[in-house]
């Protein structure tokens, strides 16, 4: 069975399936595109093209649901860490399968990105989001868009909503 919205379909996953977190591979591209597209079609995140996802595939951490009760496994969640400057990276593309909402999987993926940022000795992270309370629970604070690093704006110029952005800027120092 699949969950469908405006021709965007994702496989149904069993919510009790075991979860494994790992870095993305090119073979994961279509599943990532479908999950992000599912939420983008609902207006809850930005669309990401296959070509952009392929360019940035090394940025992403995946949560994979294993087989359970005869149901096939699949992509339960995705989140990326995208380097913007030597002192800043963006947590981006966070999408959780509907069967796994509210189970701590988003936090687990953001933590994986944070751990990678710490390994890289990054002093700070930021995120654009419509989900401010979630990022606050992950230790981020809301900041004014004008306080963001100039490199952020070069990324934003590619966005269809650049002129009318309604996302919230969130920031987290890593200590």
What are these regions, as identified by a protein language model?
Residues 1-14:
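Short acidic N-proximal helix/loop "leader" segments that mark the beginning
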Residues 13, 18-32:
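A short beta-loop-alpha structural element at the N-terminal edge
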Residues 33-69, 157:
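Active-site rim helix/loop that mediates acceptor-substrate recognition in acyltransferases
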Residues 102-115, 127:
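Conserved acetyl-CoA-binding loop-helix of GNAT-fold acetyltransferases
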Residues 119, 123, 129-156:
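Conserved active-site alpha-helix within GNAT-family acetyltransferase domains
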Residues 148-175:
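C-terminal "cap" of GNAT-fold acetyltransferases
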């Amino acid at each position: 069975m699949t969950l469908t919205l405006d021709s965007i379909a994702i496989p149904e996953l069993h919510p009790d399936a075991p979860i494994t977190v790992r870095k993305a591979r090119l073979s994961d591209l279509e599943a990532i595109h479908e999950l992000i597209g599912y939420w983008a079609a609902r207006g809850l995140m930005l669309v990401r093209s296959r070509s952009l996802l392929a360019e940035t595939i090394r940025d992403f951490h995946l949560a994979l649901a294993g087989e359970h009760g005869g149901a096939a496994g699949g992509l339960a969640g995705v989140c990326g860490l995208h380097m913007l400057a030597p002192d800043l990276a963006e947590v981006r593309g966070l999408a959780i399968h509907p069967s796994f909402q509210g189970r701590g999987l988003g936090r687990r993926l953001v933590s994986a990105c944070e751990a990678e940022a710490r390994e890289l000795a990054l002093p700070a992270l930021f995120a654009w989001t419509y989900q401010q309370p979630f990022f606050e629970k992950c230790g981020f604070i809301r900041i004014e868009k004008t306080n963001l690093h100039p490199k952020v704006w070069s990324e934003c110029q590619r966005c269809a909503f650049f002129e009318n952005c309604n996302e919230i800027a969130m920031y987290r120092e890593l200590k």
